[in-house]
Amino acid sequence: MSMKTKNQTTLVLSILAAFVLIFSSCKKTDSFRNSGKYSTVASRAIKDVEVIISSSGANFQSVMLDVQKVEIKEDLNGSNDDNDNFADADDNMDDHLKTVDDYGQWKSVGQSPKLIDMASLKNGIESLIGDATAMYQVRKIRITLGTNNYVIDNAGETHPLRLENDVEKVIYIRLHQDDIDEELALNQQKFHLYFDATNSIKLDNGIYTLDPIVRPFSIKAFGELTGQVFPEDVNAFVKIDDGMGNTIFAYADKDGGFKVRGLKEGNNYTVTFEASGYVTQKLNSVIMEKGKKTELNAVTLIQ
């Protein structure tokens, strides 16, 4: 056999080997994508994802957060899809140092940096802070704050919100299956976040500090509580205790109405109504159910 013939034979065999390798790889990928492992939280199909935030409201005219960046962490390892707690050991401090690790890769979903008035996002009002597409299971959300955070008190005075250190300007939210609302038919996922403004802001020696408390919830796995407080213009403060040491706050609107979402299932909630100059009232043994709305009877405060 001539040298030319040998070279041609080698070339043909190399091309055939490459073709077989590519074909085999494609078959494995298609088989993995069609295995259905991602059907519970995030399928291999490209999904539209939205990050939506709301708040407890606060005893301020405004609570302005300087949101610089919003990101999601996608788990690129399909072998962990059935383990809802896989990323629980993912260290937030480690995430400060790199964009990818064994738990996934960070991806920006944020819009342009903007100031958001968290005091206005109460009683069911929400704000879209991020939207993008994702192909893999989302394990975490990261919100990076800037330095222009401040509050406006009820007298109209503006006060800067001081962050204790650089770590606190980055908010991490872990996600589990119950925290995600998913429309499989629409290839859509929604991540609802609740900012606990009341417990996140502290006043010490005339200085307001921000220690952000943000938790995820879903409409499908958490309950919603609504009610009405009279007189309408008393600026009622509502405390909701789940009986397990967790308290969520709400501030009634000018018409006396309030709405709180993201409440865990339970049958021992206590709801307390307070207003300056009025007698405090309580409702005991309030029941919350997954995916359902609980509407309280109207409460009339007396002086």
Regions found by a protein language model. Give the residues of each.
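C-terminal motif of bacterial Sec signal peptides marking the signal peptidase cleavage site
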Residues: 22-25
